[in-house]
């Protein structure tokens, strides 16, 4: 009986009549939540325009009405912000929820898996297609994010997890599919799997050229029939258009005041192309000649681990995780939601420059003192040192050789300290060795854009031929198309790819 009541509660929280797929998903969700086996997981897969966001919002509102505990998570700060806006409740990044920093033992920061002290709680993870199964980051826990997430959630206290995502998007780097959206992968953890797919495009989405073309591209993925580059339909749609290269500056200059710089993004295929666009936008659209100035948008390109200023800062209570339904003072982790203090600034986080001062050259590199605000974390402001060399390089961040050079030069300053542990402690606190590595954030690659959405997206695919067509390109194109919420501009789109 309660299973049916829960299903109807979810359906009641829709703002419009749900589709058959959404009704089926609500039924699956109610069965998942009422299963007496607490080691169960639900996978909700849905393509763009099928109402994943609406369903997730209805589930959150239902849980709130029933006074049930729920935590909203996403892989990146931007994705967490979008999830929060769409659901009306706070959301946090997966890393800030499940990891805590251990005592310093070496050169780099190391984060251990946190202990989940919650009970009777649903963890909803959006953009789960980005969660990796590969062991490629030993800084965090086991190095495998999906392993750690499962271990964290399932704590024998009746916690369970709902994974939400789109399997047509780019999978994690180095993987062919998104493991967190695969039932066989989740069963391998000893979990009972509930799963459903949303495929029916909402009626209000059918007038969208963005979603129409994204659906066509997605079908190429589903049927594995990509033998030539997809042709895009523009006729009859007001939300998708071609922008010739000689009109790009004027178009961007219109988008910035219309929807805001924070809601405008150029997406391209390489760091080299992103650098070209970033310099062009700063010089020709924004009229900025300084190397770095107030108002510049930046993207962090390497994790920065912050040494806490006092012991209590290390264990700040995570407000986004538990505070929807009351604080749990025993649950301590990296940082409080809405603040960066005591934790880390993640690769991919966005920042806006508030002040720049004291530019200088040391150790063969150039640095500046800056005040940054972080729009995905309630515009929290932080004073820190940034390294200017990464702004224009084609490499994703400082190269291994550059990092080694900086390490050796900084360590010379601490050569008079006899104990290695004490030297390493000084290095860990050194502003220059730990300077934030950033690039300009007006144009980014699609992997950096994943999980985010912007009102106006300018898409540059660069030179492509049928011979260059790969499954990865189709996933890339689908992911890029679905980053736009209001208008998608295709930059220098070839006539051969117009329907």
Residue positions per predicted region:
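Short, conserved phosphate/pyrophosphate- and ester-handling motifs at nucleotide-, phospho-/glycolipid
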Residues: 22, 76, 270, 451
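ASCE P-loop NTPase helicase motor core
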Residues: 27, 31, 36, 40-228
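Short, solvent-exposed amphipathic alpha-helical segments in soluble enzyme
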Residues: 88, 281-285, 474-478
